[in-house]
């Protein structure tokens, strides 16, 4: 299987690409954020290209390791007929970035476009609020070899876009997915709007094309639609070539110059890309790559980790934030930014653990109460009665009592049933009201049984 992606992502700007209409099209009443320019009415001339859109397009190109086409860049008219395109053409730039790479997938080019309106065939209505919203199209080489690789690439791309702050995120992303298998023609699946959708569409299309090949049926070069509700693809039309779009330079828009100074300005404000941050975390803090990937899955979480790692052992902080904090965030369906958990609260909790003021189990219970809780970890511990760790002699006494009261579990453990040891640990924790250290308890149990 060979797969290439064409990913359309809306850029984060306050106004449209060639006019001053606002870009909050989702909240606005239908056909209210419009003007003669974004409707392409006769005589209406486009404004100069939105500077913020150019800056964001450059930033994303650089974060995806692209070379920048310095000098003059111009817009073309891409002609096609559809109800959401009143002019009959879409303005699309020549590539701004080219020859990039992400996650082992080569990026052929990145160029700017204007978004068309929103056509709803089932109702026969068109909302032009979206018309003219700035887009970039990210075009990859056909380097993706499986649906799983496509899913991984798109997840990593979304992470880069979130870090950049210059894109509107997965909810506005649309992907055209091109797939071919050996002996067949290329098939394009249009306007898939989620990572899950791209993965499911590729899985279905791969099976469909293999079945056609087995039956000796030709795989047509065509455009297909992915029906998310049924998780299938259906034919739309024969695939267009570039000549079908009749590209011509747009005479209403002067070329825009991309200078060295402009690129330097973008580099100064550009955040560190997540894949670069992963590499730096492993080198600077000595944590493993998998932990670094988890900690950089959100920009705010990565920033928090760095702040914590300056005050607490970085590896200890990594372990707790990777496992326990992410577990709690996932359970509550929260991003770190929305959790209300402060850096100083994480530091306080980890210091309590390091100073043996609380047990590991107590720490796990405390962190479960931390999201959107104005209490400090110490206050939570006091409220739940979790402060304090019992002394070794108290643990030894509890261990001996657990052994005496549970001879069957002891015999089962000696006969090879390792799970019985967990039962005995639980009994010791009960006797010490959860204030014994689980690791130390296991050690003392083994010494007394074996």
Swiss-Prot record:
InterPro entries the record matches: Asn/Gln-tRNA_amidoTrfase_suB/E, Asn/Gln-tRNA_Trfase_suB/E_cat, Asn/Gln_amidotransferase, Asn/Gln_tRNA_amidoTrase-B-like, GatB, GatB_C_1, GatB_Yqey_C_2, Gln-tRNA_amidoTrfase_suB_CS
Cystine residue pairs: none
Reactions catalysed according to its record: L-glutamyl-tRNA(Gln) + L-glutamine + ATP + H2O = L-glutaminyl-tRNA(Gln) + L-glutamate + ADP + phosphate + H(+); L-aspartyl-tRNA(Asn) + L-glutamine + ATP + H2O = L-asparaginyl-tRNA(Asn) + L-glutamate + ADP + phosphate + 2 H(+)
Entry EC number(s): 6.3.5.-
Gene Ontology MF annotations: asparaginyl-tRNA synthase (glutamine-hydrolyzing) activity; ATP binding; glutaminyl-tRNA synthase (glutamine-hydrolyzing) activity
One Gene Ontology term from the biological process aspect of the record: translation
Pfam families attached to this UniProt entry: GatB_N, GatB_Yqey
Matches recorded under Gene3D superfamilies: 1.10.10.410, GatB domain, N-terminal subdomain (1.10.150.380)
Transmembrane intervals: none
Keyword field: ATP-binding, Ligase, Nucleotide-binding, Protein biosynthesis
Function: Allows the formation of correctly charged Asn-tRNA(Asn) or Gln-tRNA(Gln) through the transamidation of misacylated Asp-tRNA(Asn) or Glu-tRNA(Gln) in organisms which lack either or both of asparaginyl-tRNA or glutaminyl-tRNA synthetases. The reaction takes place in the presence of glutamine and ATP through an activated phospho-Asp-tRNA(Asn) or phospho-Glu-tRNA(Gln).
Family the UniProt entry places it in: Belongs to the GatB/GatE family. GatB subfamily.
Protein name (record): Aspartyl/glutamyl-tRNA(Asn/Gln) amidotransferase subunit B
Source organism (scientific name): Methanobrevibacter smithii (strain ATCC 35061 / DSM 861 / OCM 144 / PS)
Source organism phylogeny: Archaea, Methanobacteriati, Methanobacteriota, Methanomada group, Methanobacteria
